[in-house]
């Protein structure tokens, strides 16, 4: 059976047993930000096992896409070095949610393996948990497996747990003996490749308590998993998963690209490289298809490490060009019938991978050179350890992940000081955190605060009101500013990319202008930069303030216009995010933002510069949505799971509380967000993109204006356009762009003609100077100082002169703003018969103007920074020419 037939026969078998065949969940678990990648078939049913969700069926089966490349379940380091580890694999599985249990699970597994797939019964072993007598007896009663092939093991091998607490239970594994003589019983659960696990049947029947006790679950579940690639190898009689038809199309394509064949050797470097490339191409393609993006953090960095590891191995095959992106089409062709999303996203995924490959290849060769220099230095010191500082330099400067440096070091017989690397990484993060703190300028040093209340918290009331009667609970006074904490405040503190509110705090004695608002733990801190007397309105220095404990009551008022501008821009970022995902693809994720009353900035994951057409589509869609004037609904304090059920996006690495705030625009956008927003998107008025740029590899930035600011910009651009029309004397129906293009072409042609005239004029000057120059034998040589000459014209004139007079040589000099430029030439006879070398001559002369340079014997240039030495340079040149020619 080929792999397609094996997969389909599994699904058909359980379909006949009354199971619902469900689609594979994405490898990016969008509803579980605690998980990097989907790494088991049960992930999509986790809520059922935790009794937090249900399904409209009680029996299910599927083939699940899985990635294990980080954390506890991590096969990355072993991929390529053996013939069965993968970072991407399929997991065949069947489940029962409170329906059938051990009897059916065991008998059906045996039926499929022996009656449908006809695996030899005498080669199969069943392992059970030593305390699970029920399963032990069922294997004897419900199957015809030899009784001495049922083996008991302890908790380490045959007891499954979701975590330290929660659902758990015994499991029964089915192993197959692949030894030549069938003597593999002692190798069961021994980690030997000759006796491998085929299928794991997990019986979830307990709930582990915090104190370690096992309490029976009210409902018992079945969760099974079987590695698809592994069962294909067994069914097809192959020694390795990589020898099956699952991988053959990829190997054939790699051979087509590189000319290197796959020979299934365990130790051959080329075969190791091909296994790595095939595996990593699968991981990258499926992850990116399901919405992941390479980046410098979280799952994005895991993918970037995988890609860079693969590129390093591609060098083994003599490949110095991007290769992985060319395997996406192969995967889409070979697996797109099972996973149609591969074909749908093929072009986008290819572009992302190619952009990543090109970016890293630009630094890979230089990084390898530096690595080789480091190894040579380490070897010369008589040690075998690459320092953590050096490993961190490769990471920080050339983008080498630690595991790539570790791999290269191991190949050279060296180790890496990983503790030193971790120390360097922590120091960098500490510096970054300190830099961020230094930029805030809001925290007073301990002891500078004066507190009027034991409470160190502030209640935010600004979602519903821009004014609040409050009491001052703490102040920190500096010479030029004042920090104020209130017990309750309508001022929004900078958070989630939204800048802090501005406005006024008024007491009986003072009016305090708030120019920024930040958070400090549970406190909201108001930065005051202007203080005025409440009666006279005169300015007061913050250092002269005094607060009477009996007069701490105040009115806090947010600048309404400022807040409304910020709300317009914040809601616009939600619309922009949604429009980008619809236009560019689901791989787009917010990577950062800044929202103020003046403008918005939105950073997002994407692999290439947006075209003008894409920007126009995004901008048009956002404005179309604004015109719909849909209400903006804010769901306050709802359970996180309910927010996800509403469609709110959750991303790995983001921290969410159990209860969250959701901002929803029906049919357009649902986001977890604590910021302030307009009540209707129609209040945004207008949206205008002003720039699109790169922030980092794989991260783009859009800056935009809304409302009045966008209108002002458009009117400014319109007036400028009208001024241009007037300058060009164009009628209303005439195109501006066409006329400007004509003028640009005309300007270019005139510049060409001017260049010709300059060169001709300069040629005349040089020829006259050469005609009047000194001769040594049959060689004429000149030294000449020129002014206001462009280097292109000079080069053309000099080359023409040496062609016209083969027995000539010269040194020309220009000087501008203290910088000296030297140009030397030598004609064909001067070079061939007399051995003159313009490169050597100009290098000698440049020493007198404190510079350097060189070039070919026929033509060379140099630069310097000492105009006082120009005459000495000329004299040196003349002396060298006389000496060289006279010697002939």
Swiss-Prot record:
Biological process (GO) annotations held by this record are:
alanyl-tRNA aminoacylation
Q: Which domain of life is it from?
A: Bacteria
Kindly state what the record says about how the cofactor is bound. Answer: Binds 1 zinc ion per subunit.
GO MF assignments: alanine-tRNA ligase activity; aminoacyl-tRNA deacylase activity; ATP binding; tRNA binding; zinc ion binding
Catalytic reaction(s) noted: tRNA(Ala) + L-alanine + ATP = L-alanyl-tRNA(Ala) + AMP + diphosphate
Q: Which family does it belong to?
A: Belongs to the class-II aminoacyl-tRNA synthetase family.
Q: What is this protein called?
A: Alanine--tRNA ligase
Lineage, uppermost ranks? Bacteria, Pseudomonadati, Chlorobiota, Chlorobiia, Chlorobiales
